[in-house]
UniProtKB/Swiss-Prot annotation:
Lineage of producing organism: Archaea, Methanobacteriati, Methanobacteriota, Stenosarchaea group, Methanomicrobia
Example GO BP: proline biosynthetic process
Gene for this chain: proB
Pathway(s) annotated for this protein in UniProt: Amino-acid biosynthesis; L-proline biosynthesis; L-glutamate 5-semialdehyde from L-glutamate: step 1/2
UniProt protein name: Glutamate 5-kinase
Binding site residues for substrate: S64, D151, N165
Top class in the EC scheme: transferase
Keywords: Amino-acid biosynthesis, ATP-binding, Cytoplasm, Kinase, Nucleotide-binding, Proline biosynthesis, Transferase
EC number: 2.7.2.11
Principal subcellular localisation of the protein: cytoplasm
Organism: Methanosarcina acetivorans (strain ATCC 35395 / DSM 2834 / JCM 12185 / C2A)
Length: 385
């Protein structure tokens, strides 16, 4: 077994970030931004995702390209600096992008879902919780989430905050506890110097730790179409490393590149992760300060310990005042056995405790979630039998 096979053996949740230069890579002038989509490339990605899904892997895509596609559709000259024009292009291009992704995945009987994000998604707790729950639910229904920055509503942030979605993909990967982020672009990986100007540049296949020297290898954007150069990719890898997520930067032109990466082939640059430090999201939940206590019966405790979500039917009592998105203790017969992030406020739980899931709407007048705490948002305390 190769080193990479060993690293990727337990990889289950994968984020694949696809750059603008990959989506439009064939028959396009690289000095321009407005280019047509490459349907063959999209179908190749869909085929590889399909194979991963057959092996039980969960896959999320982060897809760039909306602005470039929109500019081409509207017949606008490349690289306009006016934000309203770029926003309009993003709105037009995003719909085309999703239609083509849907068409590509439909050939393999798969459905896709569009998720557009702004900077707020990782700075606001409730928005972040909504994102996690939405992606988790889509994956449960075997839908492929396709994420992009919401360029249409950004102002000065447009293409600047996330850097052609490099940072966005890293933030998504870290927030949903992904095991691996694959960044596909038109470059082979990280070199010790610029390969365009140095014929003896060496491809670095393994980065164990991102040091100042490694960061110095990041340069300017690789072309005029995307805005994400190697510097932003190194920053993305740094974010993922701290979250316990591996990162591979590879060239999208390699045939079946995703499949080959997961099979252990030494393609591109692999950034190792501090998996022993922060991989377990449950550890953060366990160490977080609880805002209240949810008391449950023995049946609910057994369900939670069996890695199931907490439902309102098993709740006996509520203690404290807390909001949606807060961490709460789970207690049974006087003993705290877990902590979790609640989907409902303390006032709401007082009303729906002991109720069946199908009764929530009648009691509250709405039903935001069938579960009180999703299984992914529960941390079991050590020593619980």
């Amino acid at each position: 077994m190769t080193d990479r096979e060993q690293f990727f053996r337990d990889v289950n949740k994968i984020v694949i970030k696809i750059g603008t230069s990959s989506i439009t890579r064939k028959g396009c002038d690289h000095t321009k931004e407005n280019c047509n989509i490459d349907p063959a490339f999209m179908e190749s990605i869909a085929a590889q995702v399909y194979e991963l899904r057959k092996h039980g892997k969960e896959v999320i895509l982060v897809s760039s390209g909306a602005i470039g596609v929109g500019l081409n559709e509207l017949g606008i000259a490349p690289k306009p600096r006016e934000i309203p024009i770029r926003q309009a292009a993003a709105a037009v291009g995003q719909s085309i992008l999703m239609q083509d992704w849907s068409r590509a995945f439909s050939k393999y009987g798969m459905k896709v879902a569009q998720i557009l994000l702004t900077y707020e998604f990782y700075s606001d707790r409730v928005t972040y919780l909504n994102l996690r729950n939405s992606i988790s639910t889509l994956l449960e229904y075997e839908v492929v989430p396709i994420i992009n920055e919401n360029d249409c509503t950004c102002t000065n942030e447009i293409e600047a905050i996330f850097g052609d979605n490099d940072k966005l993909s890293a933030m998504v990967a870290s927030k949903i506890d992904a095991d691996l982020l694959i960044i596909l672009s038109d470059i082979d990986g990280l070199f010790d110097r610029n390969p365009k100007t140095h014929s003896d540049a060496k491809l670095l296949t393994l980065i164990k730790k991102i040091t100042p020297e490694i960061e110095s290898y990041g340069g300017d954007p690789t072309n005029f179409k995307g805005v994400g150069g190697m510097r932003t990719k190194i920053k993305a890898a740094k974010i993922c490393s701290m979250a316990g997520c591996y990162v591979v930067i590879a060239n999208s032109e390699i045939e079946d590149v995703v499949t080959k990466i997961l099979s252990g082939e030494e393609i591109g640059t692999l950034f190792l992760a501090e998996r022993h430090i922060q991989k377990n999201r449950a550890r953060w939940i366990i160490l977080a300060r609880a805002s209240g206590t949810v008391r449950v019966d023995a049946g609910a405790k057994a369900a939670v310990l069996g890695k199931n979500s907490l439902l309102p039917a098993g709740i006996v009592d509520i203690e404290g005042t807390f909001d949606r998105g807060d961490v709460v203790k789970l207690e049974c017969e006087g003993k705290v056995f877990a902590k979790g992030i609640t989907n409902y406020t303390s006032k709401e739980l007082i009303k729906i405790k002991g109720a069946q899931t199908n009764q929530i709407d009648n009691i509250l007048g709405y039903n935001n979630y069938d579960n009180v705490i999703k299984k992914e948002n529960i941390g079991i305390l050590e020593g619980i039998n």
